[in-house]
Amino acid sequence: MSFSRALLWARLPAGRQAGHRAAICSALRPHFGPFPGVLGQVSVLATASSSASGGSKIPNTSLFVPLTVKPQGPSADGDVGAELTRPLDKNEVKKVLDKFYKRKEIQKLGADYGLDARLFHQAFISFRNYIMQSHSLDVDIHIVLNDICFGAAHADDLFPFFLRHAKQIFPVLDCKDDLRKISDLRIPPNWYPDARAMQRKIIFHSGPTNSGKTYHAIQKYFSAKSGVYCGPLKLLAHEIFEKSNAAGVPCDLVTGEERVTVQPNGKQASHVSCTVEMCSVTTPYEVAVIDEIQMIRDPARGWAWTRALLGLCAEEVHLCGEPAAIDLVMELMYTTGEEVEVRDYKRLTPISVLDHALESLDNLRPGDCIVCFSKNDIYSVSRQIEIRGLESAVIYGSLPPGTKLAQAKKFNDPNDPCKILVATDAIGMGLNLSIRRIIFYSLIKPSINEKGERELEPITTSQALQIAGRAGRFSSRFKEGEVTTMNHEDLSLLKEILKRPVDPIRAAGLHPTAEQIEMFAYHLPDATLSNLIDIFVDFSQVDGQYFVCNMDDFKFSAELIQHIPLSLRVRYVFCTAPINKKQPFVCSSLLQFARQYSRNEPLTFAWLRRYIKWPLLPPKNIKDLMDLEAVHDVLDLYLWLSYRFMDMFPDASLIRDLQKELDGIIQDGVHNITKLIKMSETHKLLNLEGFPSGSQSRLSGTLKSQARRTRGTKALGSKATEPPSPDAGELSLASRLVQQGLLTPDMLKQLEKEWMTQQTEHNKEKTESGTHPKGTRRKKKEPDSD
């Protein structure tokens, strides 16, 4: 039937018109495409629904962000649907749509197509708005709505149109099976065909710290024709790089921020020392060494060890680490058809847990290392040591590598008056330190769980062994190591922790690749990168030997730069840049770098100098020192990006020289850290008054087990506190929280404002009701209850 003939059919009276609707749809199909809304379609859809649902894993539909479908404006051809039938009565249409929404059969049918209650509701709201707000509708849906209004069709006939609209706003509904295939992570060994094409020999060097396990693996590395060392830290990669070249084995260095080739012609050496994330899984080697293999369980970085273990193309792969990783490694290698040879090592020097705690900083001896788990504890301990006329070195995680090495050298030098080290668990690996006695200032380490909540937990056995093992190392002048705690009540818990067996590692980390995310983006082109990651993790399938690593830092960066126009691959690279999201200046720098990149404006040396306001002054207080550390991290970020986008970050060598100069400024600041602490106290930038020579709040007695998983300020409710000293009479709970690093002064001010507001509201309620607020009554009763 021709188009003009179809129009003639549309002039028929309403009754005859409805009777011939199927014929009209058939006539118009060549002109307007298929009509999904013919009568009887619902039953057909119901029959096909079982195949449409696909897959057995129920997705988390809260991750599906609906797209916006704009209502249709006036058409240049006019309202063809109205010409074929008649204009629609919006009130009648609304009644039809409401009836459609309430139909249980329709809701059930929607569920068969992946529309749970939440998606169904969102899709209907969008569908209704589209229908009601459009100036003209497509011919097919206009005709169906007209017939329903006149009783010639059923409301169920709207379902095909509704489903089509739902797939427009939720495109994931149309490609769930494809997304499941892309995110199928159940056979990671198949991702590395080059490694699978060779028969590798896996040798596991198992033992505690200071057992010589890494030494034996490195000797094999030195004697090989070619090799790669994969370490967890830049410091370790640098150490092997220097040792290898000193031994006459030419070795290159590859880290995220640095590339060093030793051959005069720039040719790659046969050996390379790198951080584990930077190892090549396509270059063939004779020997590969993967250090600290137990970090394969790390929630954030475990994927890098998994990738190295499964993907390195080496005839021999030497693994160094804790015995807890042996079973998992053997299981993983069973899936690749490779056998594992285990070589056990014993500690080379004895280590003992003392029966007495330090109790007071007056009892410090040369070679002592006090391990703290917060910067505020480091500052306070350093200040107390300085008051006693002693000199201490300071090492914590956010210090630049050069500063850490300088402080380690100062502490190790027998001719230097510095005989005490105050450090965080950053000393657990990567530094050679001559420590006689490890003193745990606290056994409670703040951490962030998978929900982003702050937790206070005792350190694990693995962490305790790693830190305690730094005492009395074979290569140091102290051949016997000792371990104790600052407070006596912590000593029994430390002994208990050290005696516990280390839990075997159950699973290895995985991470989506850029290629997998790109394939996701192909199917979901309008989704944000953060949303793509959420959907990928939700759809991903892993077996019991693997887990998907925590992607929170990646998502944080993705959301930070979401509004910057970048290609997906470039955006992905920016999001993998290692930044400390607790540093506002570093985060804003990532944003600024991305913005400059999007404008195609190279980030030159001159531009960066202006951005960081170079030259920088030496620090006058702790805040200045922390600001300099943040600037150092920004320069690290520039160097990291310079190896990914050389044309846009062209001045890496100049920036590296600038960073070395900054490192020197920071070293001088840390060398005089007690002076900075004094200045901070003077200007009330750091409140350490009344701080006793022990920890402020400790787990003790039976409360220890109860407080192993506490959150926020609730942790203090499960702790027993020491009686305050006479000098600390004014020491409040808020002060203790600040000193322990659980609150910043700014956070405390905000809380004080909120408390004042709440108190004002309570007083107002009291005045209006004539009754005492509950909080006020309790406060009055407290003295009587003691």
From Swiss-Prot:
Positions of post-translational Phosphoserine modification: S725
Keywords assigned by UniProt, alphabetized: Acetylation, ATP-binding, Helicase, Hydrolase, Mitochondrion, Mitochondrion nucleoid, Nucleotide-binding, Nucleus, Phosphoprotein, Transit peptide
Protein name, as recorded: ATP-dependent RNA helicase SUPV3L1, mitochondrial
Comment on activity versus temperature: Optimum temperature is 30 degrees Celsius.
Organism: Homo sapiens
UniProt record similarity statement: Belongs to the helicase family.
Reaction catalyzed: ATP + H2O = ADP + phosphate + H(+)
Signal peptide stretch: none
One BP annotation, GO: DNA recombination
Polar residues composition bias: residue spans: 693-705
E.C. no: 3.6.4.13
Ranges for domain Helicase C-terminal: 353-518
Effect of G207V: Abolishes ATPase and dsDNA and dsRNA helicase activities
Gene3D superfamilies registered for this protein in UniProt: 1.10.1740.140, 1.20.272.40, 1.20.58.1080, P-loop containing nucleotide triphosphate hydrolases
Keyword Transit peptide among record annotations: yes
Subunit: Homodimer; in free form. Component of the mitochondrial degradosome (mtEXO) complex which is a heteropentamer containing 2 copies of SUPV3L1 and 3 copies of PNPT1. As part of mitochondrial degradosome complex, interacts with GRSF1 in a RNA-dependent manner; the interaction enhances the activity of the complex. Interacts with LAMTOR5/HBXIP, WRN and BLM.
Gene name of the encoded protein: SUPV3L1
Notes on activation and inhibition: Helicase activity toward DNA substrate is inhibited by micromolar concentrations of 5,6-dichloro-1-(beta-D-ribofuranosyl)benzotriazole (DRBT) and 4,5,6,7-tetrabromobenzotriazole (TBBT). Helicase activity toward RNA substrate is inhibited by elevated concentrations of TBBT. Inhibited by some ring-expanded nucleoside analogs.
Primary localization: nucleus
Protein's job: Major helicase player in mitochondrial RNA metabolism. Component of the mitochondrial degradosome (mtEXO) complex, that degrades 3' overhang double-stranded RNA with a 3'-to-5' directionality in an ATP-dependent manner. Involved in the degradation of non-coding mitochondrial transcripts (MT-ncRNA) and tRNA-like molecules. ATPase and ATP-dependent multisubstrate helicase, able to unwind double-stranded (ds) DNA and RNA, and RNA/DNA heteroduplexes in the 5'-to-3' direction.
